[in-house]
């Protein structure tokens, strides 16, 4: 048996067990009556016990809980921001709709005012033309009256001058006395 391995022994091993691997037998080390897989299990139990004693799971869960709380707060904040953004969007949509209605109403009002101004301007211009026509007619009438008055005054002045001249030519002191006596007698 040239290929058969030699049994291994360690100084720490007090008990050596044999394992049958087919044709060859291997010796596995053991200490304090425990096999290697049992030592791994004991080490894991000790590690878990130390972790429990140092409260590592509560630290881990506390950290996870804090992280969960932060994420939840961020989600709540995001929901609040989204709700606020939607509210602002709806508000501005309503404002835009109102602004469009107001603009349309203002345009309609401006059209009505422009029409009213045009109608008033037409009426005012007609009234102005009528007033100016009447003023022109009044000026013409006044000029005619002034001309007639001037002609009358000129005629009266000419008649008075002619009367004076005639009276002066045909009327003497005797006629004046006679006329004065008649006027006095009538009184």
UniProtKB/Swiss-Prot annotation:
Family matches, as CDD domains: ATP-synt_Fo_b
Family matches, as InterPro entries: ATP_synth_b/b'su_bac/chlpt, ATP_synthase_B_chain
Protein family according to the UniProt entry: Belongs to the ATPase B chain family.
One GO CC term on file: plasma membrane
Function noted in UniProt: F(1)F(0) ATP synthase produces ATP from ADP in the presence of a proton or sodium gradient. F-type ATPases consist of two structural domains, F(1) containing the extramembraneous catalytic core and F(0) containing the membrane proton channel, linked together by a central stalk and a peripheral stalk. During catalysis, ATP synthesis in the catalytic domain of F(1) is coupled via a rotary mechanism of the central stalk subunits to proton translocation. Component of the F(0) channel, it forms part of the peripheral stalk, linking F(1) to F(0).
The protein's name in its UniProt record: ATP synthase subunit b
PANTHER family associated with the record: ATP SYNTHASE SUBUNIT B, ATP SYNTHASE SUBUNIT B', CHLOROPLASTIC
Ion transport found in the keyword field: yes
Membrane association type: Single-pass membrane protein
Transmembrane intervals: 36-53
Keywords: ATP synthesis, Cell inner membrane, Cell membrane, CF(0), Hydrogen ion transport, Ion transport, Membrane, Transmembrane, Transmembrane helix, Transport
This protein's encoding gene: atpF
Organism taxonomic ancestry: Bacteria, Pseudomonadati, Pseudomonadota, Alphaproteobacteria, Sphingomonadales
GO MF entries: proton-transporting ATP synthase activity, rotational mechanism; proton-transporting ATPase activity, rotational mechanism
Compartment(s): Cell inner membrane
Complex and partners: F-type ATPases have 2 components, F(1) - the catalytic core - and F(0) - the membrane proton channel. F(1) has five subunits: alpha(3), beta(3), gamma(1), delta(1), epsilon(1). F(0) has four main subunits: a(1), b(2) and c(10-14). The alpha and beta chains form an alternating ring which encloses part of the gamma chain. F(1) is attached to F(0) by a central stalk formed by the gamma and epsilon chains, while a peripheral stalk is formed by the delta and b chains.
Main subcellular location: membrane
Organism: Erythrobacter litoralis (strain HTCC2594)
């Amino acid at each position: 048996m040239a290929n058969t391995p030699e049994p291994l022994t360690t100084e720490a091993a007090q008990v050596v067990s044999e394992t049958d691997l087919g044709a060859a037998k291997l010796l596995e080390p053991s200490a304090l009556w425990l096999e290697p897989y049992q030592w791994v299990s004991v080490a894991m139990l000790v590690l878990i016990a130390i972790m429990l004693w140092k409260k590592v799971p509560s630290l881990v869960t506390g950290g996870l809980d804090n992280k969960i709380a932060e994420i939840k707060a961020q989600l709540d904040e995001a929901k609040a921001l989204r709700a606020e953004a939607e509210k602002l969007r709806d508000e501005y949509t309503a404002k835009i709709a109102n602004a469009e209605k107001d603009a349309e109403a203002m345009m309609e009002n401006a059209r009505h005012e422009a029409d009213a101004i045009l109608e008033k301007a037409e009426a005012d211009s007609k009234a102005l033309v009528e007033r100016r026509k009447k003023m022109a007619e009044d000026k013409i009438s006044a000029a005619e009256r002034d001309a007639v008055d001037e002609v009358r005054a000129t005629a009266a002045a000419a008649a008075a001058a002619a009367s004076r001249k005639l009276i002066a030519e045909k009327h003497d002191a005797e006629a004046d006395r006679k006329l004065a006596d008649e006027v006095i007698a009538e009184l």
